């Protein structure tokens, strides 16, 4: 069964692409009575501007008003993924092999939900992280949330 994020991705991706942006990912989050739909957009040149975010927000709002896929009232947020960009797809993970990432698992592995390490490789739907000089193999489907850990020199 498709998640709300999957449905929104399919519905909104063409509109975002029409504006010259890539729909990097979507997060839906409930906090009490409040519901937030967070869209991350990117551009090939990496230069997402405030105007890009405003344009996408207007376009996406119009689509959501017409299609009405969200039953509750919601707040829409549009931003770039930023330095500690969230990772949503295996293809996105592949772009960050050799870099540090942080992962939150749905189901704990070795009594841990939070892992951080260097992404060494991806085979099928298995990601290998080097954590404390030891390889840890994580199943992509068990990843609840992941992001790049930025390096500051």
From Swiss-Prot:
InterPro entries tied to this protein: Ribosome_maturation_RimP, RimP_C, RimP_C_sf, RimP_N, RimP_N_sf
Compartments, as annotated in UniProt: Cytoplasm
Domain of life per record: Bacteria
CDD domains listed in its UniProt record: YlxS_C (cd01734)
GO cellular component: cytosol
Major location (coarse): cytoplasm
One annotated GO biological process: ribosomal small subunit assembly
Pfam families, per the entry: DUF150_C (PF17384), RimP_N (PF02576)
UniProt KW keywords: Cytoplasm, Ribosome biogenesis
PANTHER family: RIBOSOME MATURATION FACTOR RIMP
NCBIfam families listed in its UniProt record: PRK00092.1-1 (NF000927)
Function: Required for maturation of 30S ribosomal subunits.
Family: Belongs to the RimP family.
Name of this protein: Ribosome maturation factor RimP
Species the sequence originates in: Histophilus somni (strain 2336)
């Amino acid at each position: 069964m498709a998640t709300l994020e999957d449905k929104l991705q399919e519905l909104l991706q063409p509109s975002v692409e029409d504006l010259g942006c890539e729909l990097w990912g979507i997060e839906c989050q409930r906090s009490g009575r409040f519901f937030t739909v967070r869209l991350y957009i990117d551009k090939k040149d990496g230069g997402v501007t405030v105007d890009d975010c405003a344009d996408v927000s207007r376009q996406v709002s119009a689509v959501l008003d017409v299609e009405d896929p969200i039953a509750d009232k919601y707040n829409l947020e549009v931003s770039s993924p930023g330095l500690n960009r969230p990772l949503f797809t295996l293809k996105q993970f592949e772009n960050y092999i050799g870099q540090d990432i942080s992962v939150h698992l749905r189901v704990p592995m070795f009594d841990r939900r939070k892992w951080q390490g260097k992404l060494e490789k991806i085979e099928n739907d298995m990601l290998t992280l080097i954590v404390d000089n030891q390889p840890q193999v994580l199943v992509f489907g068990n990843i609840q949330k992941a992001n790049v850990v930025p390096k500051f020199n």
